[in-house]
Structures are given as structure tokens and as C-alpha cells.
Amino acid sequence: MLYTGTDIIEIRRIKAAEARWGEHFLNRIFTPAELSLCKDRFPSLAARFAAKEAVIKVLSLPKNQSYTEIETLNLPEGQPSVNLYGQARDKANILGIKHLSISLSHCREYAIAMVVAQD
């Protein structure tokens, strides 16, 4: 079976949240590895935030899901990949999810992520 999740976000929302809450916001949402990976900062962070939301949708996770349990990094070839920890990993195991494929994109104003889960 295939499961899909998509999310889109305005990049300015991530900028505004960082301006308002600073490092506390960033550390609550992103892992240290994700933060170090995002060179063009806000477009990349917004795409990774959208990825986390798409994974939450694909796995039907609760609203209070810890965002740092969903990590989006890059494979050596450059394509994005998802690592799951804690409750997110447990839910994927319950659903029999063996593989998550992810696509990220952004333009000047928006970032989008699409996740396909396969059992």
C-alpha cells in the first residue's frame, strides 16, 4: 500500500517565527543536523518544516508530535531522506511502513514537500 502526504508553507512564516522566538523555535522544530545543513536558511528550513508536516499527515500522527522525531537530511547523492525516531518511528512500524520517499522544493515565497510511504 502507498500513503501520501503533502504540505506547503509560506517561507515568511518560518522567518517570522524565528524572529519572534529565536533559537528556541529553531531547536524545538529542527535537529542540529538539519540546522547545519540549511545554508540558504529560510527556504531550506521552510521546506524541511513542510516535510515534517507531510510525514505527520502520512503517518496520521497526533498534533502534539515532536518535530525533532522527524528529521530530513540529504543522502550523499544530494536527494533528501527522512529519519524517524521515537513515536514517529513506532507509528511507521505499526503501519508496516518500510520506506519513505520525499521531494522538497521552494520558490521565493513558498516551500513544499511531498512524502510517499510504502509498506
Curated annotation (Swiss-Prot):
Keyword flag Plastid: no
Enzyme Commission numbers on file: 2.7.8.7
NCBIfam families the record matches: acpS, pantethn_trn
Name assigned to this protein: Holo-[acyl-carrier-protein] synthase
Entry function: Transfers the 4'-phosphopantetheine moiety from coenzyme A to a Ser of acyl-carrier-protein.
HAMAP family linked: AcpS
Short name of one Pfam family: ACPS
Lineage: Bacteria, Bacillati, Chloroflexota, Dehalococcoidia, Dehalococcoidales
Organism: Dehalococcoides mccartyi (strain ATCC BAA-2100 / JCM 16839 / KCTC 5957 / BAV1)
Family (UniProt): Belongs to the P-Pant transferase superfamily. AcpS family.
Name of the gene encoding the protein in the UniProt record: acpS
Classification via InterPro entries: 4-PPantetheinyl_Trfase_dom (IPR008278), 4-PPantetheinyl_Trfase_dom_sf (IPR037143), ACPS (IPR002582), Ppantetheine-prot_Trfase_dom (IPR004568)
